[in-house]
């Protein structure tokens, strides 16, 4: 083993500041000289519209997988793709990478992008968004919001996360470094939960600029990130008159008083017929007097004289006018000037 190999295999016990910046050690053929014990295989189905494209690029797929000692099969009758290991396969994880590659190709990812997943530092994530929104109209609108006008939003997500992102049907396929995949998943899920992607894009741009400043490495970045308020425009209309709920009581409401109960309480029940009639007449005359009084007040409103200003207030006004100073010199000069104009004319 050479010195460079010994340096790579040396395990560091120092504390790690940034786990994302750690280099993944390469797995070589010398690390597994005996190969695989048993054969492993994975199969996936693809839609009918991908049949023509897969048939054209399948020789390239076989050539790419043969470099890693894997076998690939395309079954056009069943509409499936199969990858399996061989006796020469020495990397135990390459079959998982090959499975991800055929899954991406089934989700309309081109072969030139899908083959990148075979690299050690590249991963993939297929995000299912079909069940996140109940109504189809809302789902289509939010999915289009993720793409943006002329694909501008999707392109900005790709540039900020260093990932290839493809929106197809009910899934979003992402391919790139693992940190970028985490960011893409957060943006997609929040977009389907009615959070516009521009907010997360702006936050990513600010974080990228903050990472350049070493002084802010150990500080909280929340004060720099924008805070957006949730505005729910479609609120339910509230009634004009709200009914206030009465306090709950386990007992039934009391029985309302009848006419006889009211007469017993007032003592009217024990009066004879003549006394009852006299009481009714008295109440009637009192009501008539009150009505006549209100009517007289309404009629006499037109004959009430308006309030005049007091003599003291008028005298104050006159004193104020007389006390105003007059500039005699200015008035005299004005008269002389007017006389000169009259003579000259």
UniProtKB/Swiss-Prot annotation:
Provide the Gene Ontology terms for cellular component.
nucleolus; nucleoplasm; small-subunit processome
- Domain KH, by residue range, is 125-193
Lineage, top-rank taxon, reads Eukaryota
Biased-composition ranges, Basic residues, are 232-245
Q: List the disulfide bonds.
A: none
Sorted alphabetically, which InterPro entries does this protein's record hold? KH_dom, KH_dom_type_1_sf, KRR1-like_KH1, KRR1-like_KH1_euk, KRR1-like_KH2, KRR1-like_KH2_euk, rRNA_assembly_KRR1
Region of interest called Disordered, as start-end residue ranges on this chain: 232-260, 273-329
Residue ranges annotated as coiled coil are: 270-298
Asked if the keyword RNA-binding belongs to this entry, the reply reads yes
The record's subcellular location field reads:
Nucleus, Nucleolus
The family database entries (CDD domains) matched by this protein are listed as: KH-I_KRR1_rpt1, KH-I_KRR1_rpt2
**Gene3D superfamilies from the entry?**
K Homology domain, type 1
Q: What does this protein do?
A: Required for 40S ribosome biogenesis. Involved in nucleolar processing of pre-18S ribosomal RNA and ribosome assembly. Binds to RNA. Required for female germline development, cell viability during eye development and for survival of dividing cells and epithelial cells during early wing disk development.
Question: Which family does the record assign?
Answer: Belongs to the KRR1 family.
Q: How does it assemble?
A: Monomer. Component of the ribosomal small subunit (SSU) processome.
* Protein name stated in the entry: KRR1 small subunit processome component homolog
Gene behind this protein: dbe
């Amino acid at each position: 083993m050479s010195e460079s190999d010994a340096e790579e295999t040396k395990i560091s016990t120092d504390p790690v500041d940034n786990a994302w910046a750690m280099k993944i050690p390469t797995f070589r053929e010398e690390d597994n000289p005996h190969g695989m014990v048993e054969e492993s295989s994975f199969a996936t189905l693809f839609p009918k519209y991908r049949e023509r494209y897969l048939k054209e690029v399948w020789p390239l797929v076989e050539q790419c997988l043969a470099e890693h000692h894997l076998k690939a099969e395309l079954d056009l009758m069943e509409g499936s793709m199969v990858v399996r290991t061989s006796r020469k396969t020495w990397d135990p994880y390459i079959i998982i990478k090959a499975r991800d590659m055929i899954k991406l190709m089934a989700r309309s990812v081109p072969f030139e992008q899908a083959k990148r997943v075979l690299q050690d530092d590249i991963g993939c994530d297929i995000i299912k968004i079909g069940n996140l929104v109940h109504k189809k109209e809302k789902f289509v609108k939010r999915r289009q919001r993720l793409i943006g006008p002329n694909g501008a939003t999707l392109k900005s997500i790709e540039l900020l996360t260093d990932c290839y992102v493809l929106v197809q049907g009910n899934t979003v396929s992402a391919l790139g470094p693992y940190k970028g995949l985490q960011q893409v998943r957060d943006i997609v899920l929040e977009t389907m939960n009615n959070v516009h992607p521009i907010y997360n894009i702006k936050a990513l741009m600010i974080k990228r600029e903050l990472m350049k400043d070493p002084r802010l490495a150990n500080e909280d970045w929340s004060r720099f990130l924008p805070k957006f308020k949730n505005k729910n425009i479609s609120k339910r209309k509230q009634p004009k008159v709200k009914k206030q709920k009465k306090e709950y009581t386990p007992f039934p409401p009391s029985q309302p008083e009848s006419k006889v109960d009211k007469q017993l309480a007032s003592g009217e029940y024990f009066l004879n017929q003549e006394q009852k009639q006299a009481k009714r007449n008295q109440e009637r005359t009192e009501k008539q007097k009150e009505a006549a009084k209100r009517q007289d007040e309404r009629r006499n409103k037109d004959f009430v004289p308006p309030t005049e200003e007091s003599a003291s207030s008028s005298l104050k006004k006159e004193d104020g006018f007389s006390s105003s100073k007059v500039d005699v010199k200015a008035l005299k000069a004005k008269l002389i000037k007017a006389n000169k104009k009259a003579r000259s004319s």
